[in-house]
Each structure stands twice: as structure tokens, then as C-alpha cells.
């Protein structure tokens, strides 16, 4: 584990709990994956609480490819086909076709327009015909098992929204440095301290979920009270 991460943001459970608190408050978080994987940090916001200011930060401080993480059920409800029939990408990132809200947008690329597209897509009564394809927002389909099935940013995003008690949809973009290179964990920590964002890792989310599911198995009656 990165010693700077633990020094600045506490142990793995503290990091997850702080991230959940931030998400419930409508704030952003930074999630890093393994150095053996992409070794990147993604800036993540709840789609439910997403603002134009937050979208502008994603566009300005990150790669610009703003993605909307969706459950499989939502992807099916919106009738979104996958971007390709055969996914040959190294990490099997599940892009669907890109989307745009059909109403309330101009070019579709501004922060306001992208927020409009996100809000249109995640609405409980959203219909496929309300979205144009292609567009400037890139949906990602999360695996049903979350990070326990695939240790990716997409699954971590949806899992964290669920753990926070929010709608299970989030917006993410890969954090970049001013020179255009991808931000590693140490660089993400510096960015987070500047902007007051919690930082955690995908591994933190995996371990948090495993522990919570162990607790649930040990005390099913106790957890049934919270679930009702």
C-alpha cells in the first residue's frame, strides 16, 4: 500500500467511509486502481448530484472523455448497444455507443449539455428515444458483481454509489497532469489535497465489500433490520 495514501487519508475502511460521506454530500472522490493495472486515478461524481461546475472540472482537469457508469439493467432499459460486438481492449472496458440528450442541448459538448445528457439518461422513467446516438457522453456498463467480478473503475463507481445509498450511477474521467500525462496515485493525492477530495483505491472497495458481506453472513437477522 502507498504509505502517503495511508498517512494522508487513513486506513482502507476509513478511506471508503470518507468517500461515501463525500458522495452523499454531493462531493467528488478520487479512485486509483492497481499499479499493475491502469495505474490511474479517476475523478468520480454521483450522477444524481452532478452539477455543471463538477462537469467543467472533469473536462478541464481530466482526459475529457467523460463516462457515465451504468448498471446492466439501465443499459438494457435504454436499449444501448455495446460500442463493438467483440471487445478486444486490454481491460475489457464495456463502452456502449455514446449518447446525447435529444432536447435541451445545443452542440452537446458543453458542461451544461453533458450534464443534461447524464440527467436524461439516469432518470427513473428515461426512455431510449430520449437519447440520440452518437453523442458526447460515453456510457460504461458495470459488471453485475461489481468489483468482486471486475476490479475496474466502472464497477467501483457503481458499487460506491450503492454503498452510499444513492442511485447506482456515477460519472468519471481519468485525472491528467497539466502536461497531458496520466496522474499516478501520488499526483492524485496532491490534486485531492488541493481540492479537498477523499482518495481511495479499487482494492479498498473490494476489501470493504468483502468485509461487509462477511458481517452480513454472520448476522443475517441484524442486517435484515437495516434492509427493511
UniProtKB/Swiss-Prot annotation:
Its EC number is 4.1.99.12. Pathway: Cofactor biosynthesis; riboflavin biosynthesis; 2-hydroxy-3-oxobutyl phosphate from D-ribulose 5-phosphate: step 1/1. GO terms for molecular function: 3,4-dihydroxy-2-butanone-4-phosphate synthase activity; magnesium ion binding; manganese ion binding. InterPro entries: DHBP_synth_RibB-like_a/b_dom (IPR017945), DHBP_synthase_RibB (IPR000422). It comes from the Bacteria. Mg(2+) 2 binds at residues 38, 153. Keywords: Lyase, Magnesium, Manganese, Metal-binding, Riboflavin biosynthesis. D-ribulose 5-phosphate binds at residues 37-38, 42, 150-154, 174. The keyword Metal-binding applies. It catalyses: D-ribulose 5-phosphate = (2S)-2-hydroxy-3-oxobutyl phosphate + formate + H(+). Binds 2 divalent metal cations per subunit. Magnesium or manganese. The record marks 136, 174 as: Essential for catalytic activity. Belongs to the DHBP synthase family. Catalyzes the conversion of D-ribulose 5-phosphate to formate and 3,4-dihydroxy-2-butanone 4-phosphate. This is 3,4-dihydroxy-2-butanone 4-phosphate synthase. It comes from Chloroherpeton thalassium (strain ATCC 35110 / GB-78).
